[in-house]
Amino acid sequence: MKPKNTICLWFDKDAHEAARFYAATFADSEVTAVHAAPADYPGGKKGDVLTVEFTILGIPCLGLNGGPAFRHSEAFSFQIATENQEETDRYWNAIVGNGGTESQCGWCKDRWGLSWQITPRALTDALAAGGGEAKRAFEAMMTMKKIDIAAIEAARRG
């Protein structure tokens, strides 16, 4: 059964390539359907890949090849909770190493401009602790691109 709510992501013309990358990068992710355009349209021609149905960590998504009219921005991002540094590094390196760019505080962009927050649970736990622990962890996070869990835990301890 199709979900009632699906995230639709607009791509210029690379939705299928992006969906395959996400499926290969994240667990519980797969490309579930590819649909060709039944006729010419402003972003392409009949027979081109128009939409791609896929999941990212179980979240249903639809990639739409709509042409260059709209770009992704930081106003929308996927936040990926990681359990340890190895998982954090794996996701970060996959995204940045495949033509993406680093940002600050655990944020990065993939080669299609989609924003990702690679967020260790150790960081969210530290921020939720409140008080001095949260302040020190927050200040440490503000100096980082990719989150360093050992540095966050050291800052949390003071």
Residue spans for each PLM region:
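Short loop/turn microsegments at loop-to-beta-strand junctions
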Residues: 6-7, 49-50, 103-105
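Core segments of cupin and vicinal oxygen chelate
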Residues: 9-58
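A charge-rich, low-complexity, intrinsically flexible signal that marks solvent-exposed coils, linkers
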Residues: 41-43, 74, 157-158
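A generic structural micro-feature
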Residues: 44-50, 70-72, 133
